[in-house]
């Protein structure tokens, strides 16, 4: 440091200072504007990139919100379809049960009617056979008892007596 102070030359200092000032003026005149434009352009590029990133982020959030909304709607629609399918299944089961009960009841009523009809027919047939059999027995008994003249006259007199009483 002492050597620099001892070897100091004012002329050299002047020329170096003058060259530095001229260099600075030339830089300001010719290079400062392009450097500043480059820095400004770089700042604008960074600012635009940040804005684009922010816009992309917002758009991504909107897309995610839309995706979530669409997913929720799809789930709600699926749940509604499942609920409707369950209701249809339950309705079909209930309808089938009702139809089966009605068919069973109808068959029971038809069977009862058929049984009643068969019973009435059997009773009529039985009555017919009993009356035929009774007539046959009565005819045989009457033939047996009325085989002689005396019993025939007694019967006729008795019947005439009954008719007078009535």
Curated annotation (Swiss-Prot):
The chain crosses the membrane at residues 8-28. It is a single-pass membrane protein. It is found in: Cell inner membrane. GO terms for molecular function: proton-transporting ATP synthase activity, rotational mechanism; proton-transporting ATPase activity, rotational mechanism. GO terms for cellular component: plasma membrane; proton-transporting ATP synthase complex. CDD domains: ATP-synt_Fo_b (cd06503). Keywords: ATP synthesis, Cell inner membrane, Cell membrane, CF(0), Hydrogen ion transport, Ion transport, Membrane, Transmembrane, Transmembrane helix, Transport. Pfam families: ATP-synt_B. F(1)F(0) ATP synthase produces ATP from ADP in the presence of a proton or sodium gradient. F-type ATPases consist of two structural domains, F(1) containing the extramembraneous catalytic core and F(0) containing the membrane proton channel, linked together by a central stalk and a peripheral stalk. During catalysis, ATP synthesis in the catalytic domain of F(1) is coupled via a rotary mechanism of the central stalk subunits to proton translocation. PANTHER family: ATP SYNTHASE SUBUNIT B, ATP SYNTHASE SUBUNIT B', CHLOROPLASTIC. Belongs to the ATPase B chain family. F-type ATPases have 2 components, F(1) - the catalytic core - and F(0) - the membrane proton channel. F(1) has five subunits: alpha(3), beta(3), gamma(1), delta(1), epsilon(1). F(0) has three main subunits: a(1), b(2) and c(10-14). The alpha and beta chains form an alternating ring which encloses part of the gamma chain. F(1) is attached to F(0) by a central stalk formed by the gamma and epsilon chains, while a peripheral stalk is formed by the delta and b chains. NCBIfam families: ATP_synt_b (TIGR01144), PRK14471.1 (NF011041). This is ATP synthase subunit b. It comes from Flavobacterium johnsoniae (strain ATCC 17061 / DSM 2064 / JCM 8514 / BCRC 14874 / CCUG 350202 / NBRC 14942 / NCIMB 11054 / UW101) (Cytophaga johnsonae). The gene is atpF.
